[in-house]
Each structure stands twice: as structure tokens, then as C-alpha cells.
Amino acid sequence: MKGKSEPATTLLRPILDTYMDSAVALVGCTARGLDRYSCEYDVLVVTKDKLPPTSLKFGDVYADLIFVSENDVLKPGKPEQSISVALAKPVRDTTLVLSTGIAANLAVLSESARKASAARLGSALKILGRAEEAIAKKSILDADFWLLAGSYEFAYAWLLSKEVLPSPSHLLSQLRRVSRGASRWFEGFSMGAGLEAAGRAGCGARLEGVTVLHDLIRERPETGSGAATWPVARTETLSAKADELVTRIELAECYSYMGQELIDAILALLRPVSKRSIGALASGKDALLGERLIRQLGLARDEKAIRTGLDSLKEQVSHLARRSQP
């Protein structure tokens, strides 16, 4: 992604011109000092219109747009949203709604981080319970997926407990920074997320697999997503970020990032009532997930590897839960 050295007002001019009456801010990794080519612009647009998040490309710049109301900025409904606003960097703020919201949310940053961490930790416990249930039923594919999903929930809970807002494309960098003196925490995530398969080939295969999932979502309006929230630009952004990470030999980071993307995509495919399990997506004559695609996504661990990762992750989740108790 070129041109990152230019001022944000210059790079984001198409967005500023399109939403002329809106306050605009940078959020996400760019706003938090991770100004790297593999970090797209996450842009907060304050508007009265209720619009779904979207991705777009203009020139050599990729951007993910999140549309919010003034009330969402001043009084966010969720702790993680509060943290995101608190750490935002205004690009245009003529009405001072962003400045006011940032100040208000900074004042409660620690409380918001604590609540957000607790919510993610609770989610991790619930998801790991699904993984255990799947193992008991010998549904190995489901167990592999839910272990992967639980690993990311744990990682986010861990970062949020440190008042760090997770950045999926640079998650490992963030985890390494906060794991000094607590290597077992990082090891628990690594084993649960299957990072032993990380490498140039693994990242490339997973990227190809996730791209297929994006195509499947766009072809199926019954997922409730489709082209509106999964535009081609979203896939292009993903590919550009992955290419940059591979070029910089950040292969584990790339593989980790693809992991979160495949979780999001599969959950979108699971949304229809008839698709309650990964196995349901991978069986029958109309199966969406073939054996080759499953291997590309890295969802091919055996039961022993899954149990080992699950035990390691559960131990670290328990440690974080005990440490987080008042």
C-alpha cells in the first residue's frame, strides 16, 4: 500500500469529499502508531445515515469504513467501541463531536478495557466449550474451528486487559509486546491457533482459501451479508495486506491474520439456520467446503493436536480469569 508517508487528509481526500458534512477519524492500527504498509486505513465516518461497514480502494490506498452516529461517538454502546473512539485520531472535526467523544471515552478507558476483556474472556470460555463438545462427538472439523475461534477471543481478552485494542493484521506483534515475562500466555494462543503451520506456503494457501470463502458469501444472499458488507475491495484489501506481510517475511503474522478472516467468513456462512456446524458445510452433495479448501484453511489438525491445543489454551484462559478477578 503506497503513499503512507502522505498526510491523512491528502490520502483520504476521496472520503472527505464524498462525506462532506461528516466528521472523519482514523481508528484501528494506523491510528495507534502501527503505520505500516500492511495496515489499511480504518476510517470512522460520523453520519446520520445507517450504513453497513464497507471496504473500498482509491488509487493505491485501501480503507475500511465504519459509519456511526454522533451518539455512538459520545456514548458508545459497547466497551470496545468506547476504546476505539478514545484512541481515534480526528482527520476532520468541524463540530468537535470527535474531540468531545475522545475526551469522554478516554476518561473511562480503564473501565471500558476491563469490561471488554471480561466479555471476550467469557466468549472464549463459551467457544472452548463448543470445541470440547465437538471432540466428544468426534466432530473433529468443528472442534478444530472452535479451538481456533476461542484462541482469538482469548488473545483479544488478553490485549484488552492491558488496555490495548486488538489489531487483527498485527496481532502477533501486539501479543509479543505484552507477553514479556508471560511466555506461556503466548504459547497457549500459538498452540490453540495452530501457528506451527505458519509459513509462506501456509499463508498463501490460507489466503487462497479465504478468498474462496469471500466468493461464496457474495454468491449467497441467504447469509445476510453478500456484496454490501463483503465487497470485492474487502478481498483486495486482505490480499494486499497479506502480500505486504509476506514481503516483509512476517509469515506467522500473515497466517494469524488469515485465521481471523477465515473465522469471520465461516461464521457468515453458518448464519443460515440450516448450517449449524462446520460439518454441515462440508458434507452432502451441496457441500460448500471441500477437502482441498479445508486443508487450505488450515482446518486439518488431528484429534491429538486439537486436544493438546485445547488443554494449553484452557490453562491460560483460567489464569487470565483468575488475574482479572477484583
Task: Please give the residue ranges for each predicted region.
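Generic hydrophobic, helix-prone segments enriched in Leu/Val/Ile
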Residues: M1-S5, V97-V108, V210-H214
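Residue-identity detector for threonine
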Residues: T9-T10, T18, T30, T47, ...
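Internal, well-ordered alpha/beta segment that forms a basic, Gly-enriched binding/recognition surface
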Residues: E70-E132
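Conserved nucleotidyltransferase catalytic core and NTase-mimicking acidic/glycine-rich helix/loop elements
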Residues: A116-P326
